[in-house]
């Protein structure tokens, strides 16, 4: 065993990798679920509630909610917001550029996608 492997790298078992994969799949499915709701008239806060409900229905918890004081399940940026915007009641408008970051914690492992 090399010095680096002994002190810095923890190899994952096939079971751990399967759990990590499911955590990521929960995020993927969540993003697919809310994508169709990013339309004029809806708000980021509506998407956030829907995402939290779905993640919890998958026996996972929202990965960002409460992490470093984060108050939401999703981080949503609109237009001029660079990254990690908090969901608000700002109504989506035609032509908005929307970025969504989502995470889940499933059986001790995080899935994350931006």
Report the location of each language-model feature.
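Active-site neighborhoods and metal-handling regions in enzymes and metal-associated proteins
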Residues: 2-114
């Amino acid at each position: 065993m090399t010095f680096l492997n002994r002190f810095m790298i923890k190899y994952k078992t096939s079971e751990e990798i399967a759990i990590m994969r499911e955590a990521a799949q929960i995020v993927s499915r969540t993003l697919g679920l809310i994508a169709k709701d990013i339309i004029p008239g809806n708000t980021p806060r509506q998407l956030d509630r829907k995402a939290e409900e779905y993640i919890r229905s998958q026996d996972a918890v929202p990965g960002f909610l409460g992490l470093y004081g984060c108050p939401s399940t999703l981080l949503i940026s609109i237009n001029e917001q660079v990254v990690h915007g908090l969901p608000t009641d700002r109504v989506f408008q035609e032509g908005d550029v929307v970025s969504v970051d989502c995470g889940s914690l499933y059986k001790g492992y995080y899935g994350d996608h931006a």
